[in-house]
């Protein structure tokens, strides 16, 4: 996964099955937003906007297909901790991949990337048959412990509506709403209105 500055935000080369690349921008100006929308040209090109969207911004993204709504950017202070015994961490440069296996079967996983004093958590997932056992929290604890060892002091993540409760229970705080779009909205697909955005 490669990323680089793009205008006021970032362009991430995701190279995943559903996303080839993703633009990420925090409270872009209207001209910058229009530029980003024009670059979001296909269903595998995504645009994530952090911050509130006003009526003009909603008009600017009307041609795009909403992927998510109600999500939020969250942050926490990273403190030293022990990696739980059940969490296996594999490190590739500045990225750590955590996984928990139960009787040889993948039960939960996640990853985190450190840059300077910040660590970004991503793809935190518990497999359906292993949910409600606290495994997601163990993955987060393991990744936090690893990142503290690297010198990270601030954690960041993009939380889904369903994931927010887990992160809040671990001491994370929401700091801004976010919404993700992809290119190629169908003509009959509903757009995103003010009522669809987090309050």
Locations of the language-model features?
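Conserved acetyl-CoA-binding loop-helix of GNAT-fold acetyltransferases
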Residues: 32-36, 126, 132-145, 149, ...
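Conserved catalytic-core motifs of GNAT/GCN5-like acyltransferases
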Residues: 47-51, 66-76, 158, 173-191, ...
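Conserved active-site alpha-helix within GNAT-family acetyltransferase domains
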Residues: 54-65, 137, 149, 161-178, ...
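Acyltransferase donor/substrate-recognition loop-hinge adjacent to the catalytic core
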Residues: 62-104
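A conserved beta-strand-loop-helix scaffold within acyl/acetyltransferase catalytic domains
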Residues: 90-127
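Conserved GNAT acetyl-CoA-binding A-motif
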Residues: 42-51, 147-159
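A short helix-loop-beta-strand connector motif used in the catalytic cores of GNAT acetyltransferases and
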Residues: 1-9, 18-20, 70, 91-98, ...
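N-terminal charged segments
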Residues: 1-58
